[in-house]
Design a protein with these regions (language model features):
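Canonical Radical SAM [4Fe-4S] cluster-binding loop centered on the CxxxCxxC motif
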Residues: 1-10
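Conserved, mostly hydrophobic/aromatic
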Residues: 12, 29, 64, 92, ...
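Conserved SAM/AdoMet-binding glycine-rich loop
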Residues: 20-146, 154
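Short acidic/polar active-site loop segments enriched in Thr and Asp
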Residues: 25, 60, 159, 164, ...
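Short, ordered loop/turn segments at secondary-structure junctions
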Residues: 32-34, 166, 246
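Radical SAM enzyme [4Fe-4S]-AdoMet core and its adjacent flexible, acidic
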Residues: 38-55, 105, 168-199
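Terminal RNA-binding accessory module
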Residues: 176-274
Length: 274
């Protein structure tokens, strides 16, 4: 609560070095809004500078999460493109795609600006993974507002998406708005949105068949089947890849995997040299 407070880069880099020495392979940078990191200390946001410093520590993966769209700058995108160990993964909570609802939510962005951000990222990093979250059933959301959201999702074909129904909280600005929707309508809209994204997810996954990905092994199903993640997926919230291997793999290993099968959300493959 209260204003954003940033730790200075030096202290964060020192902590990161200790984590690296302790054997950490994936470093995750997260805050209420990582895109404004350093604004209170340096007079302007400096997430790009922090990421550049972290990239020198030689983690296998560095992932930054929860950056508001208005804070994603060309400088940040360029740093991600520059370093192989910074995951080309952008977690951008867009919340909605109707300008009217975005305004009611007090968001500092618009549908066109959201599209421009996605286009900027993809023009610089064509294979970037873009993750977002949307809220359906916000007070005052009309049928046409929801259709705008559906249209945006179908147009942009975002790689990863989480969605939630609006949940009323007392004494919040949204609670005082008119036009609260019944739970049945909110649930119907959520189900439709998720079905649209499910089709998109499977379509994007099928394009990965035959490609090779660096995979972090995280669990074992049986003697020859493991569960892992590519850099396209954050832990717990995204998809997994099932890895078939005749050789024994250890949890925490990085291996190269050829994608053989694609499902609605997950993938399946085998070791490159299996």
């Amino acid at each position: 609560r209260g204003k954003y407070r940033s730790r200075d880069i030096e202290s964060l880099l020192e902590e990161a070095k200790k984590l690296k020495e302790a054997g950490v392979k994936e470093l995750v940078v997260i805050a209420q809004d990582t895109s404004v990191y350093g604004r209170d200390l340096y007079g302007k946001p400096n997430l790009a500078g922090l990421l550049e410093g972290l990239a020198q520590i030689d983690f296998d993966w560095i992932r930054f999460m929860y950056s508001y769209p208005e804070g994603i700058s060309q400088e940040i995108v360029d740093v991600v493109a520059k370093y192989d160990n910074i995951c080309s993964y952008f977690d951008i909570p867009m919340q909605h795609a109707s300008d009217r609802i975005l305004k009611l939510m007090n968001r500092k962005t618009s549908r066109q600006e959201l599209k421009d951000k996605v286009d900027m990222i993809r023009s610089r990093i064509p294979d970037a993974t873009i993750r977002t979250t949307f809220i359906v059933g916000f007070p005052g959301e009309r049928d046409e507002d929801f259709e705008e959201l559906i249209d945006f999702v179908e147009e942009m074909k975002l790689d990863r998406m989480g969605a939630f129904t609006y949940s009323r909280e007392e004494d919040t600005p949204a609670d005082k708005l008119d036009g609260h929707l019944c739970q049945e309508i909110k649930d119907e809209r959520l189900q439709r949105l998720m079905m649209v994204q499910q089709v998109i997810s499977e379509e994007l996954n099928r394009k990965k068949i035959g490609k090779i990905f660096k995979v972090l092994i995280e669990d074992q199903v049986d003697d020859s089947l493991y569960i892992g993640r590519t850099q396209c997926d954050a832990e717990d919230i995204d998809s997994v890849i099932y890895v078939e291997s005749r050789q024994n793999l250890e949890i925490g290993d990085f291996v190269n995997v050829v994608v053989k099968e694609a499902f609605e959300y997950d993938l399946k493959g085998c070791l490159e040299d299996n």
